[in-house]
């Protein structure tokens, strides 16, 4: 969220340079948008503060580094960043399943484009096998149709907030 605010400000500044006749409009728009992002940022801080967990575990790729860093969360993931890998090793699965057990995690996270197989395999290798598999949206696969139906950075991050609250219980 914090990087998104910086990017929005940079875009507005460049647009104002390109189109100085509407610079005030760009400035007003970015100010209003950043206020909404600040409100959402506060909700994220509150959710993390209220959560019982301070660690999230991804049975998937991990494009959420800025998110966990911004809110002081620890994390484990099957793959670093947005790796091209799609098959987790036995060692990775057993390590992550062990972390779920060790930390008493109630949720395993995955990305919106995941088929769920890695998260399910991790779950099936835990002692309790009762974790909920939740999906965070990285926005990497949003389409024009999604945007036309109302998807925006803020709406997706609001949905992700609800998922994160569940994961941190």
Language model region names:
Residues 1-169:
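Extracytoplasmic metal-acquisition and chelation regions
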């Amino acid at each position: 969220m914090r990087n998104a605010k910086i990017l929005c400000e940079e875009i507005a500044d460049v647009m104002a340079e390109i189109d100085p006749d509407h610079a005030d409009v760009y400035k007003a728009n970015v100010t209003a948008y950043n206020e909404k992002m600040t409100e959402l940022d506060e909700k994220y801080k509150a959710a993390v503060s209220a959560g019982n967990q301070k660690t999230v575990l991804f049975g998937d790729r991990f494009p959420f580094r800025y998110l966990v860093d911004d809110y002081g969360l620890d994390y484990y993931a099957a793959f670093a960043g947005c790796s091209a890998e799609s098959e987790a090793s036995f060692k990775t699965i057993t390590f992550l399943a062990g972390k779920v057990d060790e930390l008493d995690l109630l949720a395993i996270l995955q990305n919106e484009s995941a088929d769920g197989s890695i998260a399910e395999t991790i779950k099936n290798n835990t002692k309790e096998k009762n974790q909920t598999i939740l999906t965070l949206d990285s926005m990497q696969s949003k389409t024009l149709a999604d945007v036309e139906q109302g998807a925006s950075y803020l709406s997706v991050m609001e949905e992700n907030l609800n998922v994160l609250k569940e994961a941190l219980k």
